[in-house]
C-alpha cells in the first residue's frame, strides 16, 4: 500500500476541515533513499508520506512524474519546486495566491490614520518651534530657553543618529567579513559596552540609569554564558543567510534603502519630539504659550505618549515590511534555487504594500503597544529610583521584565507569521496559527530554539543603543544646557537616544534575521527540498547539530 499523499495526512492535519496549508508539492516521483552510513539509521519520512528522492537529476516537469495533489485549502497555493525546461517564472507565478484580497484592511487604515495624526502633530509643533526659534537657539546649549528641550537637543540627536548609522553599518560589515567570530564578538562587546556605560553613570551618581544598565548587563552575560553550546549551529545558519545574500544582492539593497528610510524617520521624529516640548511646555517664559491653544503639562505628556507610540508603530511597520520582502527572496532561493524566479524583490515588496499591508500593520501594532508600555514602565522605574523608592523601583523592574517576556513572545510569532504572509499572502492571525502549528509539529521549534542569531542581533542592536545612550549622556553632562540645570531632562534624552539607536540598528539587521527565519519556515513546509536541492547545507547542519534529522522528520 502506498504511503499517504500530500493533502491526506494522518489525522486529517491537512484535510479540508482545517486551515493549514500543505507543504509545497514536489513535482518528482518519490524514490526510496538508501541508508546513509554516516548517520546509521533509515531515513525518516516527512509530511509527504514518502522518503526524499534518491537522485538529484533534472528533467522535472517532462510529464513522467507524479503531478501535484492540487492547491491547498482557503485559496493558498504552495510554491512549486524547481521548474525545469522553460524560462524562469516570476515571483507572482511561483507564490501565487488563488483569491488575493486585502487582508486585515482595518489595521492598515488605522495605521494610516496614526501616520496622518503624527504628521499633523509634527506640523503644528514644528510650526510653533519655528515661530519661536530665536528663543530656542542663542547658542549651542540654548541659554535663552530654560524650560524645555531646544535646538541643542536636535544637535544632540544628530550625533546620536550619526553614531547609530556608523555602528549599524560597521556591524553588518563585520557580520559579512568575520562570520565565525561575529557571535562571540557581539556578545563580548555588548557586555563590555553596557558595563562601561553603567559604571560611568554610577561614578557620576546617576543612580537610576546606572542600575538599569547594570541589570541589563548581568542578564545578558548570564544568557551568553549559558548558550555557548549553541554557537556552532547559529554560526552555520548565519553563514548560510549571508552566502545567499551575496548571490542575491537585492537583500542588501533592501537593507540599505530601509536603513536610509529608518534614519530619516528617526531624524524627523527627534525634531518632532523637541518641537512638542517647545510648543506646549507650560512656562511663563515660553512665548509659544501666548498663541492659540495654550500650553499644559497634560498636553505635553499626551503628545509625547502619542508620538512615541506612533514612532514605534511606524518603525516596526518599516522593519516588518523589510522582513516580509526579504522573506520572499529567501523563499524563492529555498524552493527554486535551480530556476530562480524573476522580479522576486519587486513582487514581494508589492505584496507587502498591497494585499499584506494590513496584516503587517496589525502585527506591528502589537509590538508597538508592548514597547510603549515597556517605555512607560522604564520611565516609572527611573522616577522611583530618583525619589529613593526602592520598593517601587523593584516592582517596576519586575513589571518591565514581564513585559519583556511578552515582547519576545509576540516578536517570535511575528517573525514566522510574516514569512508565511510573504509566500502565501494570508491574513495575520491565520498565518500565525498555521505557521506555528506547522513549525511545532515538524519539530523545527527545536532548531529555532537552538539558533542564537535572533538574540545575537538583538545584542548588537542593544550595543548600538548603549553607545547612543552614552553619547547623549556625555553630551548633556559636558554641554550643560540651561533647560537641564537640575538634570531632570537627562533620563528623557538618554532614553530616547537609546530608543533611536535600537530601532535604527534593528532596521539594518532585519534582512539577516529574515533569511534565517524563512529557511526555518521553509524547512517546516518541505524538508525534502532541503535534502534534495541543498544537500550540503543539510549535511553541515547534521554535523553541528545531529538532532536535526529527528527535528525535520518529526
Curated annotation (Swiss-Prot):
Q: What residue ranges are annotated as transmembrane?
A: 106-126, 154-174, 182-202, 207-227, 256-276, 298-318, 353-373, 390-410, 452-472, 488-508
The entry's keywords: Cell membrane, Glycoprotein, Membrane, Transmembrane, Transmembrane helix, Transport
Q: How does it sit in the membrane?
A: Multi-pass membrane protein
Compositionally biased, Low complexity: which spans? 1-19, 27-45
Taxonomic superkingdom: Eukaryota
GO annotation, biological process: transmembrane transport
Glycan-modified residues: 132, 137
Q: Which PANTHER family match?
A: CHOLINE TRANSPORTER-LIKE (SLC FAMILY 44), PROTEIN PNS1
The Swiss-Prot or TrEMBL record describes its family as follows: Belongs to the CTL (choline transporter-like) family.
* Protein name per its UniProtKB record: Protein PNS1
Q: Which organism is it from?
A: Neurospora crassa (strain ATCC 24698 / 74-OR23-1A / CBS 708.71 / DSM 1257 / FGSC 987)
What gene is behind this protein?
Answer: pns-1
Amino acid at each position: 500500500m502506498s504511503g499517504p499523499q500530500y493533502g491526506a495526512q494522518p489525522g486529517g492535519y491537512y484535510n479540508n476541515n482545517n486551515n493549514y496549508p500543505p507543504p509545497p508539492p514536489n513535482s518528482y516521483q518519490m524514490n526510496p533513499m538508501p541508508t546513509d552510513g554516516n548517520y546509521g539509521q533509515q531515513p525518516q519520512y516527512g509530511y509527504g508520506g514518502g522518503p526524499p528522492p534518491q537522485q538529484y537529476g533534472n528533467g522535472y516537469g517532462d510529464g513522467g512524474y507524479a503531478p501535484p495533489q492540487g492547491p491547498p485549502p482557503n485559496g493558498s497555493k504552495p510554491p512549486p519546486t524547481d521548474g525545469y525546461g522553460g524560462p524562469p517564472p516570476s515571483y507572482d507565478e511561483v507564490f501565487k495566491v488563488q483569491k488575493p484580497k486585502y487582508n486585515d484592511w482595518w489595521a492598515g487604515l488605522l495605521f494610516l490614520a496614526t501616520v496622518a495624526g503624527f504628521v499633523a502633530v509634527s506640523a503644528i509643533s514644528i510650526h510653533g518651534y519655528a515661530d519661536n526659534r530665536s528663543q530656542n537657539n542663542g547658542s549651542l546649549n540654548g541659554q535663552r530657553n530654560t524650560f524645555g528641550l531646544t535646538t541643542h537637543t536636535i544637535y544632540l540627536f544628530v550625533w546620536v543618529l550619526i553614531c547609530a548609522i556608523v555602528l549599524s553599518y560597521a556591524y553588518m560589515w563585520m557580520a559579512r567579513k568575520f562570520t565565525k567570530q561575529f557571535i562571540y564578538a557581539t556578545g563580548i562587546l555588548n557586555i563590555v559596552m553596557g558595563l562601561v556605560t553603567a559604571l560611568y553613570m554610577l561614578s557620576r551618581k546617576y543612580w537610576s540609569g546606572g542600575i538599569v544598565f547594570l541589570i541589563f548587563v548581568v542578564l545578558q552575560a548570564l544568557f551568553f554564558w549559558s548558550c555557548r553550546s549553541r554557537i556552532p549551529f547559529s554560526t552555520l545558519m548565519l553563514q548560510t543567510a549571508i552566502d545567499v545574500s551575496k548571490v542575491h544582492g537585492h537583500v542588501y539593497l533592501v537593507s540599505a534603502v530601509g536603513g536610509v528610510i529608518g534614519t530619516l524617520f528617526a531624524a524627523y521624529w527627534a525634531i518632532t519630539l523637541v518641537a512638542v516640548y517647545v510648543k506646549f511646555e507650560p512656562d511663563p517664559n515660553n512665548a509659544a504659550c501666548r498663541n492659540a491653544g495654550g500650553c499644559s503639562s497634560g498636553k505635553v505628556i499626551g503628545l509625547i505618549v502619542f508620538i512615541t507610540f506612533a514612532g514605534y508603530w511606524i518603525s516596526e511597520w518599516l522593519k516588518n515590511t523589510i522582513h516580509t520582502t526579504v522573506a520572499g527572496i529567501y523563499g524563492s532561493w529555498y524552493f527554486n534555487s535551480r530556476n530562480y524566479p524573476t522580479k522576486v524583490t519587486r513582487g514581494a515588496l508589492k505584496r507587502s504594500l498591497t494585499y499584506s499591508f494590513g496584516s503587517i500593520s496589525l502585527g506591528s501594532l502589537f509590538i508597538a503597544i508592548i514597547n510603549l508600555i515597556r517605555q512607560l514602565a522604564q520611565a516609572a522605574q527611573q522616577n522611583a529610583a530618583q525619589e529613593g523608592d526602592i520598593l517601587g523601583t523593584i516592582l517596576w523592574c519586575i513589571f518591565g521584565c514581564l513585559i519583556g517576556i511578552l515582547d519576545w513572545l509576540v516578536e517570535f510569532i511575528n517573525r514566522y507569521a510574516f514569512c508565511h504572509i510573504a509566500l502565501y499572502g494570508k491574513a495575520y492571525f491565520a498565518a500565525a496559527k498555521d505557521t506555528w502549528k506547522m513549525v511545532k509539529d515538524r519539530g523545527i521549534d527545536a532548531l529555532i530554539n537552538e539558533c542564537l542569531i535572533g538574540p545575537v542581533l538583538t545584542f548588537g542592536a542593544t550595543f548600538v543603543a548603549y553607545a547612543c545612550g552614552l553619547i547623549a549622556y556625555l553630551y548633556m553632562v559636558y554641554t550643560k544646557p540651561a533647560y537641564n540645570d537640575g538634570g531632570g531632562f537627562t533620563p528623557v534624552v538618554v532614553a530616547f537616544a537609546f530608543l533611536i539607536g535600537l530601532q535604527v540598528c534593528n532596521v539594518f539587521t532585519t534582512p539577516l534575521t529574515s533569511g534565517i527565519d524563512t529557511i526555518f519556515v521553509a524547512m517546516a513546509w518541505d524538508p525534502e527540498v532541503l535534502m534534495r536541492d541543498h544537500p550540503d547545507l543539510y549535511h553541515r547542519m547534521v554535523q553541528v547539530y545531529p538532532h536535526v534529522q529527528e527535528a525535520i522528520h518529526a
